[in-house]
Amino acid sequence: LLEMVKAVVTNRLALTVVISDIVRFTGYYVLFSMMVYQCTAVIGDMMAMTYVLSSSSLFAILGNVVAPMVCSKLGGRKKTVALFGLITGLSFASIGIFGQTTWGFTICCSLAFFFMSFIDTLDTMLYMDAGEYWLYKTGKDTRPYLLSMYNVSVKAALALSSVVLGIILVAIHYEPGVTLTGSAASTLTWATGLGPGLGYLLPV
């Protein structure tokens, strides 16, 4: 067990991938919670969430179909993940500008989910790369363990997302049941966009 932990803590590649995924997934889960506040308190229509999720899911499927073909032509996995992490983060951040309407929120999320699919295509391979590096460096095969760290990253992010969500709502002085307008609506919209946006931009 100690050797397995060491394979993550002292393996720079593995540690980078795990931390990056925790940050990314935290932003991802925060978005799903913030969607509820955005649709009810800013857009004023809970049905908007149905449109956003339906469109985003379709674009994510489309992204998963084309991503393998595109990624295979772009070269290095780390650079490709960084590139699409940047594009995904900016797509989420654009919610702050366009997200106060149903159409704007839907388009921004759909684009982000499309580009996110390119990261998902390569993400688990980065864990394998970290395992290959450790095998080359030490002669010890920890690849199965490192691949399992993907699930650990997801669960850690899920736990962190509730904390981050609470911090965001306190920071913007959110009041339940109030339809926001003006600067208050703008603040919540930016929080909705920057939550996942920073989650994808920071690991870049």
Label every model-predicted segment.
Residues 1-204:
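Membrane-embedded alpha-helical bundles of multi-pass transporters/translocases
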